[in-house]
A protein has these predicted regions:
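Predominantly the C-terminal beta-signal and adjacent terminal strand-loop region
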Residues: 143-176
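Short, surface-exposed coil-to-beta transition loops
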Residues: 35-38, 133
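N-terminal secretory signal peptides that target proteins for export/translocation
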Residues: 1-2
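Gram-negative (and chloroplast) outer-membrane scaffold detector with strong preference
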Residues: 43-150
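Sec/Tat signal peptide C-region and signal peptidase I cleavage site
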Residues: 15-22
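A short local loop/turn or secondary-structure capping micro-motif enriched for an aromatic residue
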Residues: 33, 59-61, 157-158
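Short N-terminal segments immediately surrounding and downstream of signal-peptide cleavage
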Residues: 22-36
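Bacterial N-terminal signal peptides
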Residues: 6-14
Length: 176
């Protein structure tokens, strides 16, 4: 029985073909630099369209003494339209995203775009978010099996959270 199953599986895998122009496995160097575990998978669905699925996970407390943390997980599906050919050159992107976070006692994040990031130094937030956005990017082909891409985008997110006073000891003071 096992011999037949092995032969069947080997024949299926030898008949199936895939090339670098049909799919890609990727990582985000920015997240890698912040010790966030991340992985992406992109697959071609038409001549100039791909779907990208990426995820990110950071389970680490940065400083256990002060309870400084930026813990999170999120998933981001994205559709991309390529102007020239898939996986190379200019592209437009539309994405959704959602996840969960536990962030507090972080005092190095600047205020930008109407956020309340400076509050992270005095409070801890635990919650969920969901959102959508658009982007523009470019992918440079470095070789037969290697690309590097850059993307800039804008989007919005809706978040609901519990707010805790004192980033370390944490008595709950409200919800949103």
């Amino acid at each position: 029985m096992y011999k037949r199953l092995t032969i069947l599986l080997l024949s299926v895998f030898t008949l199936a073909s895939a090339s670098a122009q049909d799919w890609a496995i990727k990582t985000n160097l920015g997240y890698d630099a912040t010790a966030s575990i991340n992985l992406g998978f992109e697959v071609a669905v038409a001549d100039k369209w791909t779907l990208d699925f990426s995820g990110n996970y950071n389970p680490f407390t940065m400083n256990k003494d002060t309870n400084m943390k930026w813990k999170h997980w999120f998933a981001q599906p994205e559709a991309r339209y390529w102007f020239c050919h898939r996986f190379g050159g200019h592209f437009l992107a539309m994405h959704l995203w959602g996840g969960q976070y536990n962030v507090g006692n972080v005092d190095f994040v600047p205020k930008m775009l109407g956020t309340n990031f400076p509050n992270l130094a005095d409070y801890r937030y635990e919650g969920f978010f969901t959102g959508a956005g658009i982007g523009y990017g470019y992918a440079w082909m470095l070789g037969n099996h290697w690309n590097i891409e850059a993307q800039i985008g804008i989007g919005g997110a809706y978040t609901w959270y519990d707010k805790y006073y004192c980033p370390k000891c944490g008595e709950k003071i409200g919800s949103n």
